[in-house]
Amino acid sequence: MTRLLVLGGTTEASRLAKTLADQGFEAVFSYAGRTGAPVAQPLPTRIGGFGGVAGLVDYLTREGVSHVIDATHPFAAQMSANAVAACAQTGVALCAFERAPWTAQAGDRWTHVPDLAAAVAALPQAPARVFLAIGKQHLRDFSAAPQHHYLLRLVDPPEGPLPLPDARAVIARGPFTVQGDTELLRSETITHVVAKNAGGAGAEAKLIAARSLGLPVILIDRPAVPARDICATLEGVMGWLADHGATPRGV
């Protein structure tokens, strides 16, 4: 029997959930629980971690999961690695639904860095006005460069004081527009943009805006994840499911 587990949290995951529901697949959608108001899904939904590889192995076995689609954020490396290990142990088929990374276009002023520490080091020594578009989890890393003013864009309001001495938070959920991000960068007199190379259309607006304004971008490259099947499109995922014996209810 086909029973799918979708590891979600991205726009792609939501599109997949709708397609699976429309086609009558038995599936569960899982959120990590890092945002306060996750987008409602048309599938039964669970929120929270699994408890590492052992916990995920237990869940897959207990729930009779036949296929896992990892549609988490490209920077959710630990969850993705856990999924690879757990599926290998249980024999469950695994596919990553992963958007392609962004690639530089004419006019881009990108500096690629491997991690957050390198992103901090790539900022200038002189005080700058930095648009920090990396989410809330790793803001504290930038306290190593306290001379800068940081503009943050967060999905949820911060629960306490920001961990940076000179920072302001804008609360907003994407997708964002090029016009809106251009106006934001211009009105805040931003001099540098720091972002993760998440890929996808929903968050690309800030990079296009930075290009139009001639701003330098420090782009954090994706972390390494163990080898697994990868599909970059919804059609590719549905084809992978068919190739791996997944069928809707009653088929």
UniProtKB/Swiss-Prot annotation:
It is an enzyme of class 1 (oxidoreductase). It catalyses: precorrin-6B + NADP(+) = precorrin-6A + NADPH + 2 H(+). The keyword rRNA processing does not apply. Its EC number is 1.3.1.54. It comes from the Bacteria. Pfam families: CbiJ (PF02571). Keywords: Cobalamin biosynthesis, NADP, Oxidoreductase. InterPro entries: Precorrin-6x_reduct. Pathway: Cofactor biosynthesis; adenosylcobalamin biosynthesis; cob(II)yrinate a,c-diamide from precorrin-2 (aerobic route): step 6/10. GO terms for biological process: cobalamin biosynthetic process. GO terms for molecular function: precorrin-6A reductase activity. Catalyzes the reduction of the macrocycle of precorrin-6X into precorrin-6Y. Belongs to the precorrin-6x reductase family. This is Precorrin-6A reductase.
